[in-house]
Amino acid sequence: MSQSKGTVVLAYSGGLDTSCILVWLKEQGFDVIAYLANIGQNEDFEEARKKAVNLGAKKVYIEDIRQQFVEEYIWPAVQANAIYEDRYLLGTSLARPCIAKKQVEIAKKEAAEYVSHGATGKGNDQIRFELTCYSLYPEVKIIAPWRMPEFYNRFRGRSDLMEYAKKHNISVPVTPKSPWSMDENLMHISYEGGILENPKNHAPPGLYLKTKDPATSPDEPDILEIEFKKGVPVKVTNTKNKTQHSSSLALFCYLNEVAGKHGVGRIDIVENRFIGMKSRGIYETPAGTILYQAHLDIEAFTMDREMRKIKQQLSQRFAEQIYNGFWYSPECEFVRSCISKSQEMVEGKVLVSVLKGQVYVLGREAPHSLYNEELVSMDVQGDYDPADACGFIKINAVRLKEYHRLQKNKK
């Protein structure tokens, strides 16, 4: 028997690609530890465990990291109102460093010098996985089969993988594969590739799995009261049926359920990948969409104007850092700490209506709001002297007068 080349921890999904990669790694002489993260996807984890063992995995780890995902990754994104290129709420981007962190922990525990993944050589995920691994385990060696000529020249498409699976008794679904790829976690589901690569093609009606079609969703709204402390949601109450959740995971799952029922969170976009190409993606982010709108509202209600301008600039940088895979970079740690500081007084309750694919803010209250009802009232003068506005306007007009004087002289 030939000597092992070493131990590799494979980020395993149980699907065709990573099942073939598991067997291929064994062919190359590696001992393989399969690691499957429960990050909120719809998966038969015990069946995946049995499959990995049958394929020859030396050991199988199935790790439930859903709560860690919510509290350590999703909540900072909610605090930041993190959104990439104005539309994408970063579901996959947030999940990858969370998954890879646990993969590194397992590799260290098992004294494995290699980690591996099934991400393609054209996408963002390879970057997110590997930058996390190198940050947390600098001496690690990474095996990325879809970047290795000996692998991608051998497996040029799904038919080659299917043939290899048949040869090695790798069980594959008997139903035809959807003509697109899908990635699911607690935050969202993404769909891309296949027929969706033509940006003109409409999403087929049967594509969406997390959200109901808004056109056929309920005609009556759910009214939710969402409570925030330091910019983090701490309680949700359905005012109609009095359902209430305050634990992070249960709260997020409940928002997914309500938003999904009403068709909230669908987007179809073309985005810029970090490696330089544009790609078309369709996303369902139900709970994330509700929290984005609710947090945006309570933050505007409680935060100083100039402070919020700076925070918005940081939020854009934060979204780019997450998308590009730099969660564990010094600049991202710095931005996260600044955003966390900005949230100290972001506390209160937001009332939202969820209906027909939309989230409507109905009202808000906060113990430390900068909103002064008497000061802003049209009916009460309060401490504000309207005459003071004259000087304010004249000072601000100086610059405009000078600009237009210059424009006039140019003619």
Curated annotation (Swiss-Prot):
Pathway the protein takes part in: Amino-acid biosynthesis; L-arginine biosynthesis; L-arginine from L-ornithine and carbamoyl phosphate: step 2/3; Nitrogen metabolism; urea cycle; (N(omega)-L-arginino)succinate from L-aspartate and L-citrulline: step 1/1
One MF term in the entry's GO annotations: ATP binding
E.C. code: 6.3.4.5
Keyword ATP-binding: yes
Residues that, per the record, bind L-aspartate: T120, N124, D125
GO cellular component terms attached to this protein's record: cytoplasm; cytosol
Residues binding ATP: 11-19, 37, 116-124
Main location: cytoplasm
InterPro entries linked: Arginosuc_syn_C, Arginosuc_syn_N, Arginosuc_synth, Arginosuc_synth_CS, Arginosuc_synth_type_1_subfam, AS_cat/multimer_dom_body, Rossmann-like_a/b/a_fold
Catalytic activities: L-citrulline + L-aspartate + ATP = 2-(N(omega)-L-arginino)succinate + AMP + diphosphate + H(+)
Residues noted as binding L-citrulline in the record, renumbered to the chain: Y88, S93, N124, R128, S181, S190, E271, Y283
GO BP terms, alphabetized: argininosuccinate metabolic process; L-arginine biosynthetic process; urea cycle
Protein localization: Cytoplasm, Cytosol
Keywords linked to the UniProt accession: Amino-acid biosynthesis, Arginine biosynthesis, ATP-binding, Cytoplasm, Ligase, Nucleotide-binding, Phosphoprotein, Urea cycle
UniProt-listed SUPFAM superfamilies: Adenine nucleotide alpha hydrolases-like (SSF52402), Argininosuccinate synthetase, C-terminal domain (SSF69864)
Role summary: One of the enzymes of the urea cycle, the metabolic pathway transforming neurotoxic amonia produced by protein catabolism into inocuous urea in the liver of ureotelic animals. Catalyzes the formation of arginosuccinate from aspartate, citrulline and ATP and together with ASL it is responsible for the biosynthesis of arginine in most body tissues.
Sequence similarity: Belongs to the argininosuccinate synthase family.
NCBIfam families from the UniProt entry: argG, PRK00509.1
Subunit structure, interactors included: Homotetramer.
Protein's recorded name: Argininosuccinate synthase
Organism this protein belongs to: Xenopus laevis
